[in-house]
């Protein structure tokens, strides 16, 4: 009985140590009147928290990124009047 308790405790410790913050793929676009400083601030927040900018768009203001949920909430709140954030996924027509 003590042995199984020891194993369960070790498993709990290991699972907590290897917990990974899951990143979402998102597309973030901005209104044309968005100051470049707002976009740069959002990119910096994503990169500083371990996210990755996967593509920067040239025809419109925006970029795609892999970002964790906490950072995504922060970027969304700080840029709510400028940014549109949506999940990056495959879209098809019927």
From Swiss-Prot:
Task: Spell out the molecular function terms from Gene Ontology.
Answer: endopeptidase inhibitor activity
Disulphide bridges in this chain?
none
Annotated GO biological process: vacuole fusion, non-autophagic
Q: Which residues form the signal peptide?
A: 1-19
Read off the InterPro entries from this record.
Answer: PBI_I9, S8pro/Inhibitor_I9_sf
> Keywords for this entry?
Signal
Q: Which PANTHER family match?
A: INHIBITOR I9 DOMAIN-CONTAINING PROTEIN, PROTEASE B INHIBITOR 2
User: Of which family is this protein a member?
Assistant: Belongs to the protease inhibitor I9 family.
Task: Please state what the protein is called.
Answer: Uncharacterized protein B24G3.190
What is the species listed in this Swiss-Prot or TrEMBL entry?
Neurospora crassa (strain ATCC 24698 / 74-OR23-1A / CBS 708.71 / DSM 1257 / FGSC 987)
